[in-house]
Amino acid sequence: EEVTQHIDSKSIFGINHRYAFNGYGTFDSKNMKMKDEFVELYKDAGFGSIRYPGGTISNLFNWKTTLGPKEQRKKQIHGFYNNQGQGGIAPNFGIGEIATFADEVDSEIVYVYSLGRGNAQDAADLVEYLNAKVGTNPNGGIDWAQVRADNGHTEPYNVRYFEIGNEMNLGGEDGTASQEYWTKYAQNKGVE
């Protein structure tokens, strides 16, 4: 007997899309937009979600330094491998750019929060930036919804899914794992 199963392409988990190296070549940093060919391929695939800022490289991602004009953004430490002399990675493909792309292709962001450098307040600020309505400022302090609006997106991004860190025990096969830096730091401070 033949069985036929219909699969809704929106129910297929999407892609793990990294911020580094201009989205690994899918983002045009000169024009600050996704490359047209990638957009078409993505739409054809019908992915329903985008995991950002990536997997293990998200462990040291500082979302706040990816906001605003690219000339003012600070380089990131790659969260997986950090080869000597690398000098950091320009976060051209930042949180605003991935959110704009997600809107364009009708996909949902699955945000991987940086357990390696974040804290509860930073995570709350991120949720406010992504999801708060302008004028609400639920965390007090910096009005992150207004920062989002000032960066060109007045409506909330409505991100529903968050992961906390990624493979925190993973070692780097092609460089020095960021976890090795944390271990050395903690040992030097007498922390076990």
Task: Locate the predicted segments by residue.
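Non-catalytic accessory regions flanking glycosidase/transglycosidase catalytic cores in CAZymes
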Residues: E1-E192
